[in-house]
Structure formats: structure tokens, C-alpha cells
Swiss-Prot record:
Native source species: Clostridium perfringens (strain 13 / Type A)
Role of this protein: Catalyzes the initial step of the lipid cycle reactions in the biosynthesis of the cell wall peptidoglycan: transfers peptidoglycan precursor phospho-MurNAc-pentapeptide from UDP-MurNAc-pentapeptide onto the lipid carrier undecaprenyl phosphate, yielding undecaprenyl-pyrophosphoryl-MurNAc-pentapeptide, known as lipid I.
CC annotations in GO: plasma membrane
Pathway: Cell wall biogenesis; peptidoglycan biosynthesis
Name of the protein: Phospho-N-acetylmuramoyl-pentapeptide-transferase
Database matches in PROSITE patterns: MRAY_2 (PS01348)
Top enzyme class: transferase
A Pfam family recorded for this sequence: Glycos_transf_4
GO terms of biological process kind: cell division; cell wall organization; peptidoglycan biosynthetic process; regulation of cell shape
Gene for this chain: mraY
Statement: the UniProt record of this protein carries the keyword Cell cycle: yes
CDD domains with a match to the protein in the record: GT_MraY
Protein family (similarity comment): Belongs to the glycosyltransferase 4 family. MraY subfamily.
Length: 317
């Protein structure tokens, strides 16, 4: 039987996000918080210029509100997941805000962004090292690896990788939202099965909020999540998986994040080494756009792939 608390968390976050959307989106319009579109991107995206951004605030606020309604006194692990969610989201918010002020797709400098991300991930790494332990589970092998002191650089690299991967995935209407609904649902189920109830409520509250946000973010998007949303989502899924000692499971359930990131790495490496590009455009979702796929088709196919790999991940546990 499904725990009523889990159902209530999904329902409440969905309702709260559904209420916040029609409040926040017009406010973003009024403040002229419109998205600047990269000229080197797909030409079909130029018409999206001016679409409100920083919409990630909708599901961030909805998740926080739901957490404190459903869990009066969250556990330390739920609070640290919330901190990761909000901390990375705040860095994204600053980046988005500067892009709007400068009226171009350049916010924080790479150095500024790196310092802020290091501050957030540094605290999370310290917490993980001290309270979670340095062992992680290995999918399919039913065993663990103890990283010892190497755990610290591993986790720092891990946070950088996951947050940037989710950020890269947020390039089509509804793509990062749809994929992450599935990822957080998976993590919520695993958290619940392992007895991490507060953490499970956080995951499903986020999933419910994302489902509501999808109403505004699906093609044609009425609002973009911005770096505010994508970095927050990356921070959330990375921290939850780490708490569960399952960071490597993200390679499976976050297969789309992985593919998106690899496509960029391969594209850059190929062009620098040979002067030729592997894909028509990177990240890979733009490659499929150039092949004539609609945004809706790409999102649907990538979501189906995520579902398949979530089942594979279940089998690996």
C-alpha cells in the first residue's frame, strides 16, 4: 500500500506549483525577466527570445513549502538535500539575474561561477565525508567501494558533473523537467524503500512540483526554468543519490544527462583534434532538431529512454 504521506506530498506540491505559476509568470513578464537566446543556437529558437526565465523559482518554492507542510521537523539528510537544492539554485539565480541585467547570454564570469559552486559543493562534500561515509554502492555488483580520502575530490567532481549535466539538458521546452520528474520519482521510491521517509517526501514533492511546472514549460514554453532551476535540480538529484550511497546510479537513471554531456565533450574534442564535428550541433538534442525532429518528439523519446534505464537501475540494486 502506498504511504498516504507520499501521495499527499505529490498532491500538495502539484497544487502549490500550479498556484504559483500564474502568479510568478506574469510577475516575470512585468519585470522583463526575458530569456536571451544564443545567436549560434538553432534558428528556430530565436523566436523564444523574451520568454520569461528564472521559472525554476516555481518548483523551488513549491517543494520547500510542501516539505515544511508534510515534515514539521525534517531529518538532517532531508535538510542537507534541501540545502543542496537551494544552494545550487541560488548560484543559478545570480547567473540568470546578471544575464537579464546585461541583456545577453553571459551572466557570472566562469571564475565567479566556479568560486560560488565550489563554496556550495565544498560544504556538501564536507557533510558527506563526515556524516554519510566514504563508501558507495556499485550497481549490479551488490558491493561497495571505500574511497577513503579520494572521496573528497570524487564528490567535488561529482557535484560539478551532475549540476552541469542537468544544465546542458535544459535546452528544449520541457526536456530537463520531464527527465528529472522520472529521476526524482525513482530516487523517491528508493529512499522510501530504504526507510529514508523525509528524503522520500522531498523527492516526490519535487516530482509533483515539476509535473505542475511542466504545464508551463512544455512546448511551446510559457516560462523557462533558467539556471536557477537546472542547477537546483542538479544539486537535488546529486545530493539525494549521494545520501543513498548511490551516486553511480545516476549514470543509469540520468542516462540523458550523461549522453548530453558526452555529446558536448566529443563535439569539442573532435573539432579541436580533426577540425570536424561529429554532430550537426551539440548538445545532442540540437542534433536531432537539425535532423528535423520536433521538440515534442525529442522530449518524448528521451523520456522513454529514461524510463527504460530506470527499470534497468532497479534491476541493478
Amino acid at each position: 500500500m502506498i504511504d498516504p504521506k507520499i501521495v499527499m506530498a505529490i498532491v500538495i506540491s502539484f497544487i502549490v506549483a500550479s498556484i504559483l505559476g500564474p502568479i510568478i509568470i506574469p510577475l516575470l513578464h512585468k519585470l522583463k525577466f526575458g530569456q536571451n537566446i544564443r545567436q549560434e543556437g538553432p534558428k528556430s529558437h530565436l523566436k523564444k527570445a523574451g520568454t520569461p526565465t528564472i521559472g525554476g523559482l516555481i518548483f523551488i518554492f513549491a517543494t520547500i513549502i510542501t516539505m515544511f507542510i508534510m515534515v514539521g521537523n525534517p531529518t538532517d539528510e532531508a535538510m542537507i538535500a534541501l540545502y543542496s537544492f537551494v544552494g545550487f539554485g541560488f548560484v543559478g539565480f545570480l547567473d540568470d539575474l546578471l544575464k537579464i541585467i546585461k541583456k545577453k547570454n553571459e551572466g557570472l564570469t566562469s571564475g565567479q561561477k566556479m568560486i560560488l559552486l565550489l563554496i556550495v559543493s565544498g560544504f556538501l562534500t564536507w557533510y558527506a565525508y563526515k556524516y554519510i561515509g566514504t563508501s558507495i554502492n556499485i550497481p549490479f555488483l551488490n558491493g561497495q567501494i571505500n574511497f577513503g580520502l579520494f572521496y573528497i575530490p570524487f564528490v567535488m567532481f561529482y557535484f560539478a558533473g551532475v549540476t552541469n549535466a542537468v544544465n546542458l539538458t535544459d535546452g528544449l521546452d520541457g526536456l530537463a523537467t520531464s527527465v528529472t520528474v522520472l529521476v526524482t520519482t525513482f530516487l523517491g521510491i528508493i529512499s522510501y524503500n530504504l526507510g529514508h521517509i523525509s528524503l522520500a517526501i522531498f523527492c516526490v514533492a519535487l516530482a509533483g512540483a515539476l509535473l505542475a511546472f511542466l504545464r508551463f514549460n512544455a512546448f511551446p514554453a510559457r516560462v523557462f526554468m533558467g539556471d536557477t532551476g537546472s542547477l537546483a535540480l542538479g544539486g537535488a538529484v546529486a545530493m539525494v543519490a549521494l545520501i543513498l550511497k548511490m551516486p553511480l546510479i545516476l549514470v543509469l537513471i540520468g542516462i540523458i544527462y550523461v549522453i548530453e554531456t558526452l555529446s558536448v565533450i566529443l563535439q569539442v574534442a573532435s573539432f579541436k583534434l580533426t577540425g570536424k564535428r561529429i554532430f550537426k550541433m551539440a548538445p545532442i538534442h540540437h542534433h536531432f532538431e537539425q535532423l528535423g525532429w520536433s521538440e515534442t518528439k525529442i522530449v518524448s523519446v528521451f523520456s522513454i529512454i529514461t524510463v527504460v534505464f530506470c527499470f534497468i537501475a532497479f534491476a541493478s540494486l
